[in-house]
Design a protein with these regions (language model features):
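Short, glycine/acidic-enriched loop or turn micro-motifs at the edges of active sites
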Residues: 55, 132, 146
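A glycine-rich phosphate/pyrophosphate-binding beta-strand-loop-alpha-helix module
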Residues: 65-138
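Extreme N-terminal cap/leader segments of soluble proteins
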Residues: 1-66, 85, 94, 117
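A broad detector of the eukaryotic-type serine/threonine protein kinase catalytic domain
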Residues: 58, 97-98, 145
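Conserved small/polar residues in nucleotide/adenosyl-binding loops
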Residues: 139-146
Length: 146
């Protein structure tokens, strides 16, 4: 029998895929199931890690959304996950999956929004990844809890 993802919804799918998964590492305080993971290390600081995927045609339409605004949004949706866990975002990694229709100038415009968000929230861009794709953009943000 085939179950459509829509029948479970996002959280139902996450619950189904992660059922029975238990952390093996002592440093993993809270894993799957909230806005961000919580990692704890001997320094007594905890690390929050989150990932948000923004996909064209699902989360935004470039007909209506300027790239600079999309860049800003892609950063702050990750920051909000960290704030939701009572943390403060410090770093972000940016991963992009792009089709050939995007130019370098387009990506500079996208990054201008990411940079603006990072400046306003005092967050460092520390790395990321790029890949070819049809339409997808992906952003990941790790952060220490204050």
């Amino acid at each position: 029998m085939r179950t459509e993802i829509a029948t479970l919804g996002e959280f139902g799918l996450i619950d189904r895929l992660t059922e029975g998964i238990k952390p093996e590492n002592e440093s993993t305080r809270y894993g799957v199931g909230d806005d961000a993971a919580v990692l704890s290390y001997p320094s007594e600081k905890q690390i929050l890690v989150t990932t948000d995927l923004l996909m064209e045609g699902v989360h935004f339409d470039l007909t209506y959304v300027p790239l600079k605004h999309l860049g800003y949004k892609s950063a702050v949706v990750n920051f909000s996950d960290i704030y939701a866990m009572n943390g403060t975002p410090r770093q972000i990694t940016v991963s992009l999956a792009l089709s050939k229709r995007f130019s370098v100038e387009d990506m500079e415009e996208l990054y201008s929004g990411i940079r603006l968000a990072c400046q306003q929230y005092h967050v460092d861009i520390i790395g990321g990844d790029t890949s070819s794709s049809l339409t997808c953009l992906l952003y990941t943000s790790p952060s220490p809890r204050d």
